[in-house]
A protein has these predicted regions:
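N-terminal chloroplast transit peptides
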Residues: 1-23
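Membrane-interface "cap" regions at the ends of multi-pass membrane proteins
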Residues: 21-76, 91-93
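Membrane-interfacial loop- and helix-cap regions that link adjacent transmembrane helices
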Residues: 34-40, 45, 96, 102-127, ...
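The first (N-terminal) embedded transmembrane alpha-helix
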Residues: 44-62, 174, 253-258, 295, ...
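Alpha-helical transmembrane segments of multi-pass membrane proteins, especially transporters
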Residues: 50, 80-84, 88, 130, ...
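Central hydrophobic cores of alpha-helical transmembrane segments in multi-pass inner-membrane proteins
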Residues: 58, 88-97, 173-182
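Membrane-water interface regions at transmembrane-helix termini and the short interhelical loops
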Residues: 66-70, 154, 174-195, 268, ...
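Extracellular loop-to-transmembrane helix junctions
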Residues: 66-107
């Protein structure tokens, strides 16, 4: 169960999104950059694909374990996938709400929408929430790098010292993560997006293939390899676990986490009208839901109760296809780390109110300290446990459900955003649901910490 907690930080109808007759379809005002140039724009297709890639992160690899926490029965995948799709729809609606609020208030950031609609003086709180959540993501990435490297190096002809998690992660942090995090222009990491998408698609393909080819079933070639390697064999059956369901719901409360980028997707959309933006949002989330369902169902069907928090750890070391997936995911995570890290560093400067001049002076020491912190956490806390489950579930629910719905309700109250009666009810319900999911996630993490789940 602690393995499942590690990746918790990493898991209304569309008609309601149509502008009401009381409000015309707005276009977002796009500020000109220095020199009068206007920022480049993205097409609907490009934005949709980018959003799908933004949503589908390494956290999807924990979903099979999430279903297993509920039940090891093969039938459990059906209602679990329905829940994945349902919360995906609600998450998409909340994502779209942020874009609508930005269009209505003339703001271009998640924090800006909050300050304009809710409270100008509490913007730092929004920055703090998103910064901490991003920091947890960086730590989770270090854990994934440590796990994938450990699996790949275990049988490799390398010095035994390098196979130690603490040694490898320390060297990797100093030689790879720190230099990448110091880059001023992250455009050079653009290929990482392609590698990441390709790696996740490949991993999904391998997971589905192994669910169908029977090699991990009793008597199968790779089942024998699991026994030889001392790994858990696939196990099915067992009763439904209410406590495990709390953890799965907490995971789903954060699986679709991308909402702090909602304003940017609207801002960068070519001809940014609400109908075009909604096509991006629902298209991107639909792709993500399909991806989540395929990996969750296939991984659970293959391993059942033996599904680990990082499903790749459940595969045999002798599985060459799975090893390739481990390598691709490891590379993608390493290249994505600096993108997350930039948000952590900038969030720290914002919260600490560091002046631009001092930011330049503190950039190197701050980067060293923060990279060291995430690497040390990845070494010492192989399972983020209570910190990720408690803080992640609460902050994730806030970012996805509570904050967007509160922005919409407050903007409506101030006359900046038109909401019909059905939408007001939907937003209030989602707002309450966000608090409930936060409480459930926090409760589940505490109970797990106490050994009650």
């Amino acid at each position: 169960m602690p393995r499942l907690l590690t990746l918790l930080a990493l898991a209304p109808a569309a008609a309601l999104l149509k502008p009401t007759r009381r409000a015309p379809v707005p276009k977002l005002r796009v500020p000109a950059e220095a020199g009068g140039a206007v920022a480049s724009k993205s097409s609907v297709t490009s934005s949709t694909l980018n959003l799908a890639k933004n949503i589908v992160g390494a956290g999807v690899l924990s979903l099979p374990a999430g279903i297993a926490a509920c039940s090891a029965s093969k039938k459990a995948a059906v209602p679990a996938c329905g829940l994945i799709a349902g919360l995906g729809l609600v998450s998409a609606y909340c994502f779209a709400l942020v874009g609508r609020a930005c269009a209505a208030t003339g703001t271009t950031t998640y924090r800006g929408a909050w300050e304009s609609a809710v409270d100008k003086d509490s913007g730092a709180l929004i920055t703090g929430i998103t910064t901490f959540k991003t920091l947890v993501g960086c730590i989770a990435y270090c854990i994934i790098i440590g796990d994938t490297a450990g699996s790949l190096l275990s049988g490799a002809a390398v010095p035994e010292l390098l196979k130690r998690r603490d040694v490898f992660l320390s060297l990797f942090g100093a030689a790879v993560l720190f230099p990448l995090s110091m880059l001023r222009d992250l455009k050079s990491l653009a290929p990482a997006s392609i590698i990441g998408l390709g790696g996740m698609l490949y991993t999904a393909g391998v997971t589905v293939l192994r669910a169908l080819d029977g090699t991990y079933q009793k008597g199968g070639r790779l089942a024998a390899a699991l026994v030889k390697e001392g790994k858990a064999l696939p196990k099915f059956g067992g009763a439904f676990s209410p406590g495990g369901s709390l953890l799965f719901i907490s995971m789903l409360a954060t699986s679709y986490l991308a909402h702090y980028n909602a304003a940017a997707y609207y801002d960068e959309l070519e001809n940014p009208t609400l109908p075009r933006y909604n096509r991006v949002v629902y298209g991107g989330f639909a792709m993500a839901v399909g991806f989540f369902v395929s990996i969750a169902a296939a991984g659970h069907r293959t391993f059942g109760a033996a599904s680990q928090g990082l499903i790749l750890n459940s595969f045999a070391g002798a599985d060459k296809l799975a090893n390739a997936a481990r390598a691709l995911v490891g590379v993608a995570v390493a290249c994505t780390y600096p993108l997350l890290f930039k948000g952590v560093r900038e969030g720290y400067f914002d919260i600490a109110k560091v002046s631009p001049a001092n930011q330049e002076k503190q950039r190197t020491p701050a980067t060293i300290a923060m990279v060291a912190l995430t690497v040390l956490a990845g070494i010492k806390i192989t399972d983020l446990g209570f910190v990720v489950a408690f803080g992640g579930a609460i902050l994730g629910s806030a970012i996805i459900y509570v904050i967007p719905s509160q922005i919409a309700l407050s903007a409506c109250k101030k006359g900046k955003l038109a909401l019909g009666g059905a939408e007001k009810l939907a937003c209030r319900s989602i707002n309450v649901m966000g608090y409930v999911l936060a409480v459930l996630g926090g409760t589940a993490s505490v109970l797990s910490r106490m050994g009650k789940i």
